């Protein structure tokens, strides 16, 4: 049952992650002129590694499910750390949290394969800016992305009390990666839709 849930959750997370990536280049009728005219290469870069990342995440989930299944009285449970102080794993309200976590693990994998993660497993400013601006020759877009990535990294560092000299645990990596991705997507969307001002 848990294995079936894990596979279902992985599929939902992949769809959610793919849909969110489409928002990274919202060129359309509502976009101001001379903004976001060129699509960044981030979608192509994700497409190149997403299948491999999906397989890695599925393998990890199956391994985790087997460990849970064979554990006596649930005393050994890696995922419990992630849900500490929260609701029981089987509670129905956890489903969206699980999907979010799996999508975050996918993004962490994508970031890792695009050199946007440091040696301790944390997303980096230079790596993320390079990933999200590759293929775009627009100063305003670059500056908006730089500001957005900086703000998002600072926000997640504060939220998760990140100490960058410490190695990130797997559950932390996934949650941080999702929040960083979600935040950067919002910032880029704000810029492309004209809700964020250019630097002149």
UniProtKB/Swiss-Prot annotation:
Record keywords: Disulfide bond, Olfaction, Secreted, Sensory transduction, Signal, Transport
S-S bridge residues: 105-174, 152-183
Keyword Signal: yes
Pfam families (UniProt xref): PBP_GOBP
Signal peptide: 1-29
GO cellular component: extracellular region
Subcellular localization(s) per the UniProt record: Secreted
GO BP term (any one): sensory perception of smell
One GO MF term: odorant binding
Assigned protein family: Belongs to the PBP/GOBP family.
Function: Present in the aqueous fluid surrounding olfactory sensory dendrites and are thought to aid in the capture and transport of hydrophobic odorants into and through this fluid.
UniProt protein name: General odorant-binding protein 70
Organism name: Anopheles gambiae
């Amino acid at each position: 049952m848990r294995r079936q849930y894990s596979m279902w959750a992985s599929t939902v997370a992949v769809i959610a992650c793919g849909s969110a990536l489409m928002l990274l280049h919202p060129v359309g009728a509502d976009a101001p002129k001379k903004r976001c005219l060129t699509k960044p290469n981030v979608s192509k870069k994700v497409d190149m590694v997403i299948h491999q990342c999906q397989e890695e995440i599925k393998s990890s989930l199956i391994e985790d499910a087997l460990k849970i299944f064979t554990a006596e009285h649930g005393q050994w449970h890696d995922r419990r750390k992630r849900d500490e102080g929260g609701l029981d794993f089987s509670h129905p309200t956890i489903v969206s949290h699980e999907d979010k976590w799996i999508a975050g693990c996918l993004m962490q994998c994508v970031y890792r394969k695009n050199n946007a993660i440091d040696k301790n497993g944390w997303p980096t400013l230079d790596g993320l800016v390079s990933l999200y601006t590759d293929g775009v020759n627009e100063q305003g877009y670059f500056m908006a992305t730089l500001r957005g990535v900086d703000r998002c990294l600072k926000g997640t560092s504060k939220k998760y009390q990140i100490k960058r000299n410490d190695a990130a645990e797997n559950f932390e990596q996934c949650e941080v990666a999702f929040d960083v991705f979600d935040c950067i997507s919002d910032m880029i969307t704000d810029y492309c839709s004209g809700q964020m001002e250019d630097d002149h």
